[in-house]
Amino acid sequence: MILSDQNFLQTQWKEPQTAQSKNTESKCEFHGNSNEVKPIGSLNGQSIAQCRIHTGKTVPIVKGGEQARMEENEIYAIETFGSTGKGYFHDDMETSHYMKNFELADEKIPLRLQKSKGLLKLIDKNFATLAFCRCWIDRLEETKYLMALKDRWMAMVGACILQSFAGKIIGKRANLLLNLII
């Protein structure tokens, strides 16, 4: 969404009550059980740019978040996440997804091993600088890169070629993560 309405531009994201009340009041039925859906307050919408997410500003889905102003011609991904778990995301767990470092998007990256080069080429072709998880490499049926993944993955993170993001929804074993439309 590109914003250009001057009245809307003056709005601060102080209290996004609609998102919070919709999340808090929601229930979902799963396998015959009714579950309360709680907002995951630490997962926010964010400003985005072409082939780049997380460009600086966030849009909270619960009260008390960051108070930033939207500027004209900025683009945002407004995401409202809810969970049947405890309603928070623990980000110091094992890595859940990766992104290629945007600053290196157009640079030739010197890698010594052929499998590492092949893995990076696969990432460039299929994901560029957008987020992906390791199982998506499996789904591409690129089994020849599985050893490179295991052996070279953390080396690529350590060399700042890939950024790693960790996290897990906290709660019951069978949590549901819902991306709610409000």
UniProtKB/Swiss-Prot annotation:
Biased composition (Polar residues): 1-23
GO biological process: proteolysis
Signal sequence bounds: none
GO cellular component: cytoplasm
Keyword line: Aminopeptidase, Cobalt, Hydrolase, Protease
GO molecular function per UniProt: aminopeptidase activity; metalloexopeptidase activity
InterPro entries for this protein: Creatinase/aminopeptidase-like, Met_Aminopeptidase_Type2, WH-like_DNA-bd_sf, WH_DNA-bd_sf
Family: Belongs to the peptidase M24 family.
Official protein name in the record: Putative uncharacterized protein T27A8.3
